[in-house]
């Protein structure tokens, strides 16, 4: 059950994504990393059709690195989000990509969090969710988020979101991989749903 969640703070950005790949009623893989890390300061996570997501993440990351080398374009979350948007728009009329993406990281001046949906609608947001998480967790994110949030508080919010998804979704979510972008680089954590007793 594809789900990803993102939260941005003043000096960090966090993205969490489930690690399970399923096809119809079958579980294909239980420990898949749905992230693409670019230059230790930007993270992309995509939900939807995993073939589309993998190919799009690879295409966008390689194209962005090429543009940086060839044309001197500085990579930022904004640049990558707009590249994803262009790729989605190109495919809309031929064969629509079934992906939603979250791009988080450190831009030239501040930390950014971008959301791109499967139709190419793009927005810069303080928090977002995609996939099945979008149906459930916005209430928690809206209630708990503040502009001066800390990393620990953001992880606590994400834990509440993961617990809610475990409670509401039919398919068993084993855990979420979390990427935290800070000035010191990218940290990786795992969030496991806490079962109520």
From Swiss-Prot:
Keyword Aminoacyl-tRNA synthetase among UniProt keywords: no
Cellular component aspect of the GO annotation: cytoplasm; nucleus; proteasome core complex, beta-subunit complex
Biological processes per GO annotation: proteasomal protein catabolic process
Coiled coil start-end: none
Protein localization: Cytoplasm; Nucleus
PROSITE patterns, A to Z: PROTEASOME_BETA_1, PROTEASOME_BETA_2
Cytoplasm as UniProt keyword: yes
Keywords: Cytoplasm, Nucleus, Proteasome
InterPro entries: Ntn_hydrolases_N, Proteasome_beta2, Proteasome_bsu_CS, Proteasome_sua/b, Proteasome_suB-type
Pfam families linked: Proteasome
Family: Belongs to the peptidase T1B family.
Assembly: The 26S proteasome consists of a 20S proteasome core and two 19S regulatory subunits. The 20S proteasome core is composed of 28 subunits that are arranged in four stacked rings, resulting in a barrel-shaped structure. The two end rings are each formed by seven alpha subunits, and the two central rings are each formed by seven beta subunits. The catalytic chamber with the active sites is on the inside of the barrel.
Role, per record: Non-catalytic component of the proteasome which degrades poly-ubiquitinated proteins in the cytoplasm and in the nucleus. It is essential for the regulated turnover of proteins and for the removal of misfolded proteins. The proteasome is a multicatalytic proteinase complex that is characterized by its ability to cleave peptides with Arg, Phe, Tyr, Leu, and Glu adjacent to the leaving group at neutral or slightly basic pH. It has an ATP-dependent proteolytic activity.
Protein name: Probable proteasome subunit beta type-4
